[in-house]
C-alpha cells in the first residue's frame, strides 16, 4: 500500500527525485554527516534508533516508497553497499557474528518511513535469548523453529 501524499516534490541537483519532507532525502541535502558510505544510486547511514550497535540503513538516493519500486540498478547499488558495509562493520566490531537484513514494505508490514530502506542489523552472541528462526518470528506466534 502506498500513500499518494508521499510523491516526489522536487528534483535534486544530482537529478534524483526527492521529497523535501522526507528524512532520508533530507540527509542527502542538509545532513550528509550521517552518511557513512555512498555510491551513485544509494547511501548507507547508521540507524538513529539502533536495534543493536552499528545497525545500518541502506537507502536509495531516489525517493521511492518501498523495495518494489526500485529499479534493477538501484537494487544492485544497494546490494553492493550492503556487502561493503558488512566488511566495514566486521572490521569495526569483532563481536559481530551474524546479520539480519530486511525491509518493511507497507504499513501492515510495519513500514513507518515512506522512503525505501534496508535494515542491516549486526548480531552478537547473547543479544537475544532465543534467536532461532530470525525473521520468521516477525509475527511471534507464527514462526516455526
Q: Where do the language-model regions lie?
A:
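HIT superfamily nucleotide-processing domains
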Residues: 1-145
